[in-house]
Amino acid sequence: MAWVAWFTGLPGCGKTTIAKCVKLNLIKKGIDVKILQLDEIRRSITPKPRYTEEERDIVYASLAYMAKLLSEAGVNVIVDATANKRIYRARARELIPDFREVFIRAPLDVCMAREAERITEFSPKGIYKKASDEKAAVPGVNVAYEEPLAPEIEVDTTKMDPAQSARFIAERLSNPEK
C-alpha cells in the first residue's frame, strides 16, 4: 500500500507549485507519485462549481476516495486541495491507511498577493477579489479555514521558497521517520 500526502493551506499559499516540485524531487529519488489537483478534478465532479458547503462535502469525499483507490493500487499520491475544514482531512485520514497531512503555511495577505498574480490552467483566479465583493465563499476570508492541529509535515512559505519547501517535504515523505 502506498502513501497519500494531503497538501492543505489557504488558496494561494503555494500548494500546487510545491506539489509539482515535490513530485520532481521524489522522482529523482526513484519514487513515483501522482498529483490529484482539486481544481482540475472539480471540473469533472461539478462542471459548473458553486462552491457551496454541500458541493465541498461531495468534492472532498470524492477526492479522498480517488486517493484511496490509487494508494491501494500501489500509487503514492499527493492531494493538492485546500480542504478548509478539519473534518474533510479527518475523513480522508480514516479512509486511507498511510495518510500524511502536509500543511503549507502562509499568512492571508501573502496568499492574496500571490493569488492575484496567479497564472494557471485550472486554479481559479481572482477568488479573493470575488470574496471581497461577496460573490464567492473563500476559505480564510468569508469561510473559515481550520488549520491542521498536528500535521505530519509543515512548511512556512514565508521562510522557505518553493524549492526549499519541496526538498524538505520530499525528504520527509521518502523517510517518514525523520
Describe the residue ranges of each PLM region.
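Walker A (P-loop) ATP-phosphate-binding motif of ABC ATPase nucleotide-binding domains
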Residues: 4
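Conserved phosphate-donor/acceptor-positioning beta-strand/loop module used by diverse small-molecule
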Residues: 80, 95-115, 155
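Hydrophobic anchor at the beta1->P-loop junction of P-loop NTPases
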Residues: 7
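The conserved Walker
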Residues: 11
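Loop/turn-to-beta-strand initiation segments
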Residues: 32, 73-77, 100
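Small-molecule kinase domains that catalyze NTP-dependent phosphoryl transfer to phosphate-bearing small molecules
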Residues: 105, 114-168, 176
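Walker A/P-loop
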Residues: 16
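Conserved substrate/cofactor phosphate-moiety recognition/catalytic segment
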Residues: 19-68, 72
